[in-house]
A protein has these predicted regions:
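Residue-level detector of Asp-centered blade-edge/turn motifs that repeat once per structural unit
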Residues: 36-37, 76-77, 120-121, 173-174, ...
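A flexible loop/linker signature enriched in serine peptidases of the S9 family
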Residues: 25-26, 44-50, 58, 63-69, ...
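Glycine-rich phosphate/pyrophosphate-binding loop
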Residues: 315, 320-326
Length: 349
């Protein structure tokens, strides 16, 4: 009751033990992408962009803002990295030198923008955002269904490429064709073992003719297309054979001839990429792996040194409790504030 809350003061301490520079083996690295030459891997960790040698070692922190940075994308020459940052309130596309330095903001729309790929000539960055549906391809719900745009790497006016969702873009070397995963309806991208009419498929889009072609038609999820350096084989992530996400591949000439590349049993494989020398790179169970041809996956041993600030905050609550209950003997009261369970004596002692 209101009286009950007036008499009980709850003090919450939020945060973690204050640490001054520490080294740790990180877990739950996300948005993983290997560099074109296969020597480095960019990834997101705790809201910052890092890169690490593909053979493992100490990671280099590239962004240091208080904001959240994610989705690093290498330029074709490996000299720049595009990424998303919400440092101005919503996610915009930025680009920075791959060795670190000042980042340039490329997009300013009030919606969120997520970079997907550079064009092969390195002149444009493709990104997804829910900005403006064309009349002929408006989708519901509008805020969840994006369109595909491009922006010059040097900055300038954005241009709509497709009026329908197209994510995880992968170009062929000519730049005339790109592969993408579709989005037919809204579904949490982290949901596992999802089968329905709106599961993602992999498509090609011919920029010269405007033709879309579906390459995968199975009932589950197919996503994250990656074209091999020879331009003949497409790698992708899929939930097939009753299992979780693994890496699969098929020859472009025979999309129905799908073969498994990895055979992880427990957790999904995420964030697939490939270097120009054919090295696969992906995330599994929070860590990063590389894989050459038909050889076994190799875990990348990574060390991250951070100087995290104190994140302790003291909060005083006199209202807002939910799910209150009284013990059977009437002497104690249990309640929840901010997702935490507290117990106090009924006489407020």
């Amino acid at each position: 009751s209101h009286t009950f809350m007036k008499k009980i003061f709850v003090y919450l301490t939020l945060g973690f033990t204050t640490l001054t520079s520490y080294a740790a083996t990180p877990l739950w690295m996300r948005d993983i992408q290997i560099s074109p030459d296969g020597t480095e891997i960019a990834f997101c960790y705790k809201g910052d962009i890092y890169k690490v040698p593909a053979k493992g070692g100490a990671a280099t922190q590239l962004t240091t803002q208080d904001s959240y940075e994610s989705n690093p994308i290498w330029s074709p020459d490996g000299r720049q990295i595009a990424f998303a940052s919400d440092r101005y309130g919503n996610f915009d596309v930025f680009v920075m030198p791959a060795n670190g330095g000042a980042a340039q903001r490329l997009t300013t729309n009030s919606t969120g923008e997520t970079p997907s790929a550079f064009t092969p000539d390195g002149k444009y960055i493709l990104f997804s955002a829910a900005i403006q549906d064309p009349v002929e391809s408006a989708l519901f719900p509008r805020s969840a269904m994006t369109e595909l745009y491009k922006v010059p790497v040097t900055g300038g006016r954005t241009e709509q490429v497709l009026g329908t969702p197209a994510e995880a873009i992968c170009f062929d070397k000519s730049g005339n064709l790109f592969f993408y995963q579709d989005q037919k309806g809204f579904e949490d991208q982290w949901r596992k073992h999802h089968t329905s009419s709106i599961t993602r498929d992999i498509w090609t889009y011919d920029t010269r003719t405007g033709k879309h072609s579906n390459l995968t038609r199975h009932a589950g999820e197919d996503r994250n297309p990656i074209l091999a350096p020879d331009g003949q084989t497409l790698y992708f992530l899929s939930e097939r054979n009753g299992g979780s996400f693994n890496v699969y591949a098929f020859p472009l000439a025979q999309p129905e001839s799908v073969k498994a590349v990895t055979d992880f049993k427990t957790h999904p494989v995420r964030f697939l990429s490939m270097s120009n020398n054919g090295t696969l790179c992906y995330g599994y169970d929070g860590e990063i792996y590389t894989q050459q041809g038909g050889s076994a996956p190799q875990k990348v041993q990574i060390e991250i040194t951070r100087d995290d600030p104190s994140q302790v905050e003291y909060l005083n609550y006199t209202n807002g409790a939910t799910s209150a209950t009284v013990s059977p003997d009437g002497k104690q009261i249990g309640f929840i504030i901010r997702g935490e369970v507290f117990v106090t004596s009924a006489d407020y002692a």
